[in-house]
From Swiss-Prot:
Region spans: G-loop: 538-544
Matches recorded under CDD domains: C2_PI3K_class_III (cd08397), PI3Ka_III (cd00870), PI3Kc_III (cd00896)
InterPro entries documented for this protein: ARM-type_fold, C2_domain_sf, Kinase-like_dom_sf, PI3/4_kinase_cat_dom, PI3/4_kinase_cat_sf, PI3/4_kinase_CS, PI3K-type_C2_dom, PI3K_accessory_dom
Domain spans labelled C2 PI3K-type: 25-177
UniProt GO MF annotations: 1-phosphatidylinositol-3-kinase activity; ATP binding
Protein name as annotated: Phosphatidylinositol 3-kinase VPS34
Catalytic reaction list: a 1,2-diacyl-sn-glycero-3-phospho-(1D-myo-inositol) + ATP = a 1,2-diacyl-sn-glycero-3-phospho-(1D-myo-inositol-3-phosphate) + ADP + H(+)
Annotated family: Belongs to the PI3/PI4-kinase family.
Classification via Gene3D superfamilies: C2 domain, Phosphatidylinositol 3-/4-kinase, catalytic domain, Phosphatidylinositol 3-kinase Catalytic Subunit, Chain A, domain 4, Phosphatidylinositol 3-kinase, accessory domain (PIK)
Highest classification ranks of the organism: Eukaryota, Viridiplantae, Streptophyta, Embryophyta, Tracheophyta
Protein's organism: Arabidopsis thaliana
Length: 814
């Protein structure tokens, strides 16, 4: 480091807690005097029991909680050598932050005796943070005064300082490495220092007490600076006692010189030079670090410049295209033109990256058209995984009949499931007043093209196919009417069920036998012919959802679904779609966790359908069978197997518990209780009711994941090999899904314009919470330890058990 070079840290950049060490108390404690003498008395026959209380004051006000040392009884000197860490951080400090230190004696009986106090500023007159050892003189009989200015300064006044203080100051510099170390001279100096200490002690007697503390030292000096810039620069206080705001018109604007330099650096005339540029090792590492950034991270100016500079050498790296396109200055026509030319010459990107190009970050029609061309490579099953988000992405298009809408319609013409779901997804968004015209245009385009279809193998032409889809809407309207009628019935759940069957057998008997079969909204490949009144019922809950059994053309065939009115199922639809996608990603890595991604379809903002899976809630199982193990023994007994359950059933239960533990943690699913955890006869556990996602939860202190002690007991307890296997499945699944974090983040980014409550409230915050759950700052091994700690924390959480009891009482009285 040069002689004129001064390296430093800014206090606002240090995110560590304030830390220092209490070394010792120097001097003799005062002897017992009269009670009115103003000095704390210490009985000669009692040994002092001392502790030191440390508190941080900012601008004269206490900040954070005070900390105490342990008791000390042996001395003098009374040596603690104890590290104190405050709850406040260095970045929170102001220029007038000070530490208040008070020494107490608890040997006096019931009341604590005050020895004395002192305060010390954390920054010196040069606005540099103090470091190293500090010797503070106590004001005996006074508690440390944290106000500013203080009445108990620990700094010894200049006129009272002697030779000892001067030497101690030099000693402090020596320990910080600011004075050169010479071995033989150091030994002589230390001996002389001890002699001077004895002389000074004899000279001044024992009139003063000193506390020695050691402040934390950093690699460089720490200079005070507040975080953030103040946009309002106030003038000094004048005689008029008025505040005057002075506006700096250039504050926040770009620097013309920097703009000029940037233009020259990105000049198209440099294209010939840039073609042959190759990054150095340091630049290559920087580029690789940028390419690993999640899609939600904004690139800095230097990072954008770096990618633009080496754009030609990066063309073989398909991961770099989306990052490169974010570096382009699209307002510059020539630069945008070159970027489009390079885009078509770039290595073909994956479908996951194409989804990022459809986000609101990219407005260029050419870029969005390129993304659609990449999506054409996806098969129908993969496309259905993203269909919900692709419909939401229509909001970010620049025209009503965009490439994306035409692509979705063309693929829907080839697959009846895609056609049915596309129609419903678009129809639900017609309630969005801002984009209603955009979605209606896509709806019309779908209708026009389906009607033109020629007859298929079964003789059904395009017009008949469209009418079968329209009749789905008519069916949901009639089910809404039934729900309202049933809710108006006074009485218990049984009376409401009787009313439901009465309606289906009387006024609405046409619903038991349709004139023509209707395609099931949940499974469009399945035709339904009518409702079986005797097998239909409703659930015991506030909204009384209908549980309906429909006939199918096969002899004795049926399908069951749930119709819900009064609840926004779009959020459930999104979560279950994510479960389905994650199940697919896990299976691609040969990990089948026996998940149950049941079908959900929102048919409006307050209505929808769900697939009915025969199962029972954990609350019901524990109430009737006392344990999950007893319940599974009933359906899959095996006397020779562990816990009396077949190995297949137990393995299914463990895998499904692991799968949903990981998924609900990543998606931040809230409001988990034993009534929305269901278990099938074959051991598959799954979650329902996703009213709270992305970290929102109506209950206080929710655990990271829902893993109750009954589930752990069903695996043989926390010490069993099966619980170890469960944790192994969790960690393996977590690391697999982390590899696809960009895909999941891109899908949620496409939902940013949605009116789904938990996303619409703050889309950016929700996506950042999701990104945080993936812990992209860790490697796979570190994530294994991290997730195991999460599991242990969730199992031992006490508060959720109390909330679960309260919830059971509420269900009982419903």
């Amino acid at each position: 480091m040069g002689a004129n070079e001064f390296r430093f840290f800014l206090s606002c950049d240090i995110n560590s807690p304030v830390t220092f060490r209490i070394e010792k108390l120097d001097g003799n404690l005062p002897v017992k005097k009269s009670s009115d003498s103003g000095v704390v008395s210490i009985a000669e026959e009692k040994k002092p029991e001392l502790y030191i209380e440390c508190a941080l004051y900012i601008d004269g006000a206490p900040f954070g909680l005070p900390m105490r040392t342990r008791l000390k009884t042996t001395g003098p000197p009374y040596c603690w050598n104890e590290l104190i860490t405050l709850s406040s951080k260095y970045r929170d400090l102001t220029a007038h932050s000070q530490l208040a230190i008070t020494v107490w004696d608890v040997s006096c009986g019931k009341t604590e005796g005050l020895i004395g106090g002192a305060t010390v500023l954390l920054f010196n007159s040069k606005m540099q943070m103090k470091s190293g050892k500090q010797k503070l003189r106590l004001w005996q009989g006074k508690e440390a005064d944290g106000s500013f200015p203080t009445s108990t300064p620990g700094k010894v006044p200049r006129h009272e300082r002697g030779e000892l203080e001067r030497l101690e100051k030099l000693m402090n510099k020596y320990e910080r490495g600011q004075i050169q170390s010479i071995d033989w001279l150091d030994r002589l100096m230390l001996k002389s220092l001890d002699t001077i200490k004895e002389q000074e002690s004899t000279k001044h007697g024992s009139s003063h007490l000193f506390v020695v503390i050691d402040f934390c030292s950093f690699e460089h000096r720490v200079v005070f600076q507040e975080s953030g810039a103040n946009l309002f620069i106030t003038a000094p206080i004048g005689s008029t006692n008025e505040f005057v705001t002075v506006w700096d018109t250039e504050l926040g604007k770009t620097n013309p010189s920097e703009n000029k330099q940037l233009k020259l650096a990105r000049s198209l005339d440099r294209g010939i030079i840039d073609r042959d540029l190759k990054p150095s090792n340091i630049e290559r590492k920087s580029i690789q670090r940028v390419l690993k950034y999640p899609p939600t991270r904004t690139l800095s100016g230097d990072e954008r410049q770096l990618l633009w500079k080496f754009r030609f050498s990066l063309m073989s790296e398909k991961r770099a295209l989306t990052k490169f396109l974010r570096c382009v200055e699209w307002s510059d026509v020539q630069e945008a033109k070159q970027a489009i030319q390079l885009m078509y010459k770039w290595e073909m990107i994956d479908v996951c990256d194409a989804l990022e190009l459809l986000s609101p970050l990219f407005e260029s029609e050419e870029v969005r058209a390129y993304a659609v061309s990449v999506l054409e490579r996806a098969d129908d099953e993969e496309l259905q995984c993203y269909l919900l988000q692709l419909v939401q992405a229509l909001r970010f298009e620049r025209s009503d009949r965009s490439c994306l809408s035409q692509f979705l319609v063309q693929r829907a013409l080839q697959n009846i499931e895609l056609a049915s779901f596309l129609r419903w997804y678009v129809a639900v968004e017609l309630h969005d007043h801002v984009y209603a015209k955009r979605f209606y245009s896509t709806y019309e385009l779908l209708e026009e093209n389906i009607i033109k279809l020629p007859p298929g193998v079964n003789g059904e032409d395009g017009y008949q196919l469209w009418q079968s889809l329209v009749r789905q809407t008519e069916l949901t309207a009639q089910l809404c009417s039934i729900t309202r009628e049933v809710r108006n019935v006074r009485g218990n759940t049984q009376k409401k069920i009787e009313k439901l069957r009465q309606l289906l057998g009387g006024l609405l008997s046409e619903l038991t036998y349709f004139e023509e079969p209707i395609r099931s909204p949940l499974t469009p490949n399945v035709l339904i012919k009518g409702i079986v009144a005797g097998e239909s019922s409703l659930f015991k809950s506030a909204l009384h959802p209908l549980r309906l059994t429909f006939r199918t053309p096969e002899e004795g065939g049926s399908c069951k679904l749930i119709f819900k009115k009064g609840d926004d199922l779009r959020q459930d639809q999104l979560v279950v779609q994510m479960v389905w996608l994650m199940d697919r990603l896990l299976k691609l890595e040969n990990l089948d966790l026996c998940l149950t991604p049941y079908k959900v379809l929102a048919t409006g903002h307050d209505e929808g359908m769900l697939e009915f899976i025969p199962s029972r809630s954990l609350a019901q199982i524990l109430s009737e069978h006392r344990s999950i193990t007893s319940y599974l023994q009933k359906f899959h007994p095996d006397e020779h197997a562990p816990f009396g359950i077949t190995a297949t059933c137990l393995d299914t239960f463990i895998k499904s518990c692991a799968g949903y533990s990981v998924i609900t943690y990543i998606l931040g699913i809230g409001d988990r209780h034993l009534d929305n955890l269901l278990l099938t006869d074959d051991g598959r556990l799954f979650h329902v009711d996703f009213a709270f996602i992305l970290g929102r939860d109506p209950k206080p202190f929710p655990p990271p994941m829902k893993l109750c002690k009954e589930m752990v007991e069903a695996m043989g307890g926390a010490e069993s090999q099966y619980y170890t296997r469960f944790k192994s499945y969790c960690c393996e699944a977590y690391n697999i899904l982390r590899k696809s974090s960009n895909l999941i983040l891109n899908l949620f980014h496409l939902m940013a314009g949605s009116t789904i409550p938990d996303i619409a409230s703050d889309p950016e915050k929700g996506i950042l919470k999701l990104q945080e759950k993936f812990r992209l700052d860790m490697d796979d091994e570190a994530c294994i330890h991290f997730f195991q700690d999460l599991i242990n924390e969730s199992v031992s959480a006490l508060f959720p058990q109390m909330v679960e009891t309260i919830h059971r009482w509420a269900q009982y009285w419903r």
